[in-house]
Amino acid sequence: MESIVDTEDTIAAIASAISLGKGGIAVIRVTGEEAINSCKNIVETKSKYAWESHRVFHGYVKDNLENKYIDEILISVMHSPNSFTGEDVVELHCHGGVIVVNKVMDTLLSNNNKVRIANPGEFSQRAFLNGKIDLTQAESINQLINAKNLKSAEIAFNGVKGEIKKKIDVIKNDLIEQLSEIEARVDFEEDFSDFNYHDFSRSIKNIKEKIEILIENTKRGASIHNGISIALIGKTNVGKSSLLNLLSKKEKAIVTNIPGTTRDMIEVNLTIKDIPIKLVDTAGIRDTDEYIENIGIEKTFEMIQKSDYIIYLYSLEDGFNKDDEEIISKIPREKLITILGNKKDLIDSKKNDQKTFSSDIVLMSIKNNEGEKDLVDKIVKKCGSKEFENIDIFLNERQISNLRDCLKNLNDTDPIIANQLPFDLLSIEVRDGIKNLSRITGQELTEDLLNNIFSKFCIGK
C-alpha cells in the first residue's frame, strides 16, 4: 500500500530480550536503504559470503571513532524485497551481555549519522506498509510476543499465518457480491427482473450470522488469551494463599496463621490440563476495623463480579456457617462456583460437610496436598478444554469494534428491506460495511490510527 508515514530513514533496535542483563546471544536489527552500508562501516570480515542475501557470516565489530574492537559476531543479511520489512535488513548477532550489546548499538549509531533508533513496532509497521503483511498479521505478531500461555500463542500464530484475514475476506467477498448485484441493477435496471428483497435479506442474514459467530468466539478466545479468571474466595485463614501456592507450584503468596495477611490480590498465570488459568488470591472476608484490610476486602467483592469462576474455601474444622452462607449469597447465580472444604486432616473422616451440598464440593487438606486431583478434575470439568476446541483466532478490541460497525451497517438495511425502499439505498450501507471490514486488515487507515496501533508494540519488532 502507499506509505502514509515516513519510511525513508534507516532504523536500528535491539530485537532480543536482554532485560535480565545477560544472555548467550543478543540481536540488533537494522532496516532501510542504508542498512548494509551502515553495518559495513563497523564490521570487519574476511568471509567470502559477506553481505550476500540470506547468508550468515563471521565478523568483528569495530568502533572506528575509538579504533577499538568491540565484539565477535555473526551477521545475517536479507536484501530487499525478500525480508521481513521488504527493505534491506541486517541482523547483528552479538554476545548477550547488556554492556556488550549496548556498546555495539552505540557504535552503530555513532559511526553512522544516517541511522536512528527505531520507534516501538516500526519494523512491523514497515512490513505492513510495504505489503509484506496485513494489519491483522502485524497485530497477531504482537499478541504472539505477549502470549501468557501455550494455547494463546498457538491462536496468535494462526493470526500471523493470515487466518484472521482469510475469515474477514470471506465475509467481505460475500458483501462485495451483494454490492455488485445492487450496483449492476442501478446501472442496467432494464436488463433485470424486479429486485428480490427476500433473497437479499436472507443473504445479509447469513453474513450477519458469520460476523456474530466471530464476535462470540472472540469472547471465549479472550479467556484463552488472558486466562480463565478463577478467584479464590473465603474468610480469613481458610487456605486461599496455600491453595494458590499449591496449584502454581511456587511460593507466590505469604502464608501465616495471622488473619488478614493477604491485603491485596495476587495473580498467577498457569495452565491446568491445557486450560489457561489466571488464578487470583483475594483478601479474606471478615468484619474488621483495619482500614487497609477493608480496602482489600472491597477488592475481593469486586473480583467476585469480574471473575469467570469462583472457588469458595471454608474450614472443615470450623464448619460451614451463616457467615459462609452470607458471603455465597452475594455471588451471582450465573457464576461457575466450586465449594472447597479445607483442613480435612483436622476432622474425623466420618464427619464431614459433604452432605451439606447436593454437589460441587471438594474436600482437601491443602497443607498435606490431599485432594488436589479432585479439585483439578472439577476445574477441568467446569472449564473443560472442549470449550476452546473451535477457537482458532483471537480478535482484539479494534478488530471487534470494526466488526460491530459492519454489523450495524447491515442491521441498518432492515428498514430499507422491510419497507421495500429504493434498493439503491442498500448500496450505501453495504459499501460502508465493506469499508469497516477493510479497516480490520488495514486497507482503510489514517496515519494517526496506524501510529497508535504500532506504538503498542515492543521496540525491535
Curated annotation (Swiss-Prot):
The species this protein was found in: Prochlorococcus marinus (strain MIT 9515)
Gene: mnmE
GO CC field: cytosol
Binding site for Mg(2+): 241, 262
Residues bound to GTP: 237-242, 256-262, 281-284
Major subcellular site: cytoplasm
GO molecular function: GTP binding; GTPase activity; metal ion binding
Name of this chain's protein: tRNA modification GTPase MnmE
Positions of the TrmE-type G domain: 227-384
GO biological process: tRNA methylation; tRNA wobble uridine modification
EC assignment: 3.6.-.-
Gene3D superfamilies, per the entry: P-loop containing nucleotide triphosphate hydrolases, Probable tRNA modification gtpase trme, domain 1, tRNA modification GTPase MnmE domain 2
CDD domains assigned: trmE (cd04164), TrmE_N (cd14858)
